[in-house]
A protein has these predicted regions:
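Hydrophobic alpha-helical segments at protein termini of multi-pass membrane proteins
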Residues: 1-198
Length: 198
C-alpha cells in the first residue's frame, strides 16, 4: 500500500486540538485561581475523580459488559449511544457528587468552577491531547518520508497492515481533526456547568 501525504490543514487541526486540550485547562486553572480566588485542590480532586471513576471503574464495567453483550451493542448505534451516555452519567456524576459532598471545601462557586476545570481538563488532555500528539508524530513521520523508510524494513504483510492503520491520517477530512478540539471545548464547558450546578 502506498503511503499518502497528510494535508497541512489536517496537521493544523491536530495542532489546534492539541493546544485546546492543554491550554484550555491550564488557562481555566489560572483564571479560577487568580480571578475567582479558588483553591488549587479542587482542580486536582477533579483530575483524580476522572481517573478513578472513568479510567478505572467505568472502564472495568465496560470490559465486562462488552464481553457479555458486545455484539448487541456494536450492532445498534442507538443502543450503543444510550449505553455510553448512561454509563458516563452514572460514573462521572456519581464521582462529581461524592467529590462535591465530601472533598471540595468550601463548596462555593470558585471551587466548583475549579473542580470542573480539573475534571474536564484532565479528560481533554488524556483523550484528545494524547491522541493529537500521536497524530502529529505520525503525520510528521509520513510527510518527511521516515514512515516509508520504516515500512520498507517490514515484510509486505506487516507493511500493508501498518500503512492501512495509518491511512486515516491522510484520508480523514481535515475538518475532522479540528472537531476534536471543538468537542473538548464543549465538553469542558459542560463539566464546568455541571460542577457549578451540583
Amino acid at each position: 500500500m502506498t503511503v499518502g501525504m497528510v494535508p497541512g490543514a489536517s496537521i493544523a487541526g491536530m495542532v489546534f486540538s492539541l493546544v485546546v486540550s492543554f491550554a484550555l485547562p491550564i488557562g481555566l486553572f489560572v483564571y479560577a485561581k487568580k480571578k475567582l480566588g479558588a483553591k488549587a485542590a479542587p482542580f486536582f480532586i477533579g483530575c483524580g475523580v476522572f481517573f478513578v471513576m472513568v479510567l478505572m471503574l467505568e472502564a472495568a464495567i465496560h470490559r465486562i459488559v462488552f464481553q457479555l453483550a458486545g455484539e448487541a451493542l456494536a450492532g445498534s448505534v442507538i443502543l450503543y449511544a444510550v449505553y455510553g451516555g448512561l454509563m458516563a452519567a452514572l460514573f462521572e456524576e456519581t464521582g462529581r457528587y461524592i467529590a462535591m459532598r465530601f472533598l471540595v471545601k468550601p463548596m462555593d462557586f470558585p471551587n466548583a468552577f475549579m473542580y470542573g476545570a480539573g475534571h474536564g481538563g484532565v479528560e481533554a488532555m488524556l483523550l484528545c491531547g494524547v491522541a493529537s500528539i500521536s497524530n502529529i508524530a505520525g503525520a510528521v513521520m509520513i510527510n518527511s518520508g521516515t514512515m516509508s523508510a520504516q515500512l520498507a524494513t517490514l515484510d509486505a504483510e506487516k507493511a500493508a497492515d501498518t500503512a492501512a492503520a495509518l491511512s486515516a491520517l491522510w484520508t480523514t477530512p481535515s475538518l475532522t481533526f479540528f472537531a476534536g478540539g471543538v468537542e473538548r471545548i464543549i465538553a469542558v464547558v459542560l463539566h464546568l456547568s455541571l460542577s457549578i450546578l451540583v
